[in-house]
Amino acid sequence: VKHEITKVSKEFGDAYKGDYAHFTLKEIYEQPDVILRAGETTIEGIEKAVEYIKNAKNIYITGSGTSYNSALIAKQILSKYVKIKVEPIISSELQFAPETIEENSIFIAISQSGESADVLEAVRIAKKLNCKIISIVNLLTSSLTRKGDVVLGMNCGPEIGVAATKSFTAQITILYKIIQKLSENITINFEEFSESISKMIENPKKIQKIAKELKHVSDIYILGRGINYPIAIESALKLKELTYIHAEGIPAGELKHGPLALMDTDVFVIIINPNDSTYTDTLTSAREIKARGAKIIGV
């Protein structure tokens, strides 16, 4: 019996942590390289995915945990840059509302392992409705790979750490590569992205100093607006998974609808506020929090 040979994206040696204290740290430092590699073995796949998306009447995108947060970002960037509407769906919820999906739609499924039971169940429901499946997956020998009409490989190597780090970066990179193909007016410099992350992580002392201050905190709130809101949700998930501290991502504009009542001198708030269209409004939210005595970490 002849079996087809599948080439994996990385070497088995990448499953060793080397001189790093733990795998998560190693995988954080691999992110600059991941940006350059994500999707590089699936250029034809990206082009085919773009054709599906261009001709789609309805597009859904699903995932669990970090992959769902990537789906939320996909909704924002596809709408903003190429005016394409996408509906994110939590994989575990679809079985309770399968009527959400229209027949003959495009269904994008994201999973690092390609073996998440909830994601595979969501794909099963979508295939039953004659949807075309675009699989964004790291493990190219996985069940999700086999179920995809188009497969986009993250190509980020083994992810041993419990918390998704480099695979999240790979997922977002692939989504931006799709956008670049969808629009003739957008040019994205992925090398510049890679260099920016390298600069950010090359001097960890400031981050370590902040981490020591947060060591005994029991609650952390993370705020953001626009595309920074799903980043806040993902940041909160990382804190919960790795530190066992209660962390919550909040849309900064919703601060006055409940969360502001929790702000006092014992609370730490991380505010994601780059110099974009959300900057001024988010700064106003920061002032409201500061007035109640909460400690603020600005990103």
Stretch-by-stretch model annotation:
Residues V1-P32:
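Intein/HINT protein-splicing elements and their conserved insertion hotspots or analogous self-processing inserts
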Residues K2-T6, S142-G148, P204, G253, ...:
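Short, functional N-terminal and low-complexity linear motifs
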Residues E11, I90-S91, P251:
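Short, solvent-exposed coil/turn linker segments
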Residues F23-Y60, V150-F268, T278:
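Active-site phosphate/pyrophosphate-binding segments
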Residues E51-E195, R225, K238, I272-V299:
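Glycine-rich phosphate-binding loops that contact phosphosugars or nucleotide phosphates
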